[in-house]
Amino acid sequence: MCELLGFSASQPTEINTLVSEFFSHGKDNPHGWGMMSSSGMYKRCERADTSSELKRLVKKLPPQTTYLGHIRFATVGSIKDENCHPFSALDITGRSWTLIHNGTIYSASKLIPFVHHQSGDTDSERLFLYLMQQLNAAQKEKPLDIYHRCELIDDLVKDLSPRNKLNLMIYDGELLYIHKNMKQTMKYREHGAGVIFSTNALDDAQWKDVPTAQLQVYKDGKLVFEGTKHNAEFVPTLQYINANDAMHI
């Protein structure tokens, strides 16, 4: 499966060692890497752990207040730059939204129309385009403050979680939204002036499990919103487990 990395802090914090460890997992997720930092957004369809470009970016990475990282194991969509995460766009107010996703969308007919509008061919990009459509529609009716943005994202993840694996991180230029609906697939711990989130623990420190099936929203390293706990936990079937094991052979 893909792996996700997120960071939110109140002041610039050095995360190079943790980021380097995260991207070393590229050998098991060889189909691309991507990152969003204060230096910009970069993504390539190459192995993260052998990418000279990525090594240079991580080495030069300045202290961060917000960071997103992704390594891809392709399950839906071909292997090309357009299918690598993050996905990013401006809403109608000029706010920048960025998404990384780990999972598969098995059931979501409302995403089908976006097949004709996406740059690549992943379900993750269709998910992002649907998110942007819903945000723009809501903002045409009224401005969305922090609370209303949290409510909207909470409603979206509750709506899309049933029968889908929806582990994701979203950054809107101010808030970091965290959601997982499969147990033991995302952890977090405090780091410096903030909190770091990762699919897998990145060192020997004490990591905690991110709550399952409940949106968590952070601002400047602090939890500012908890969504409604929902029941759409993704429980992998034997077929799902066997298919993922086969892809790693």
Locations of the language-model features?
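Short helix/loop capping segments that flank catalytic or ligand/cofactor-binding pockets
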Residues: I15-N16, G77-I79, S107-K110, I178-K180, ...
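Catalytic core of PPM/PP2C metal-dependent serine/threonine phosphatase domains
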Residues: E141-M182
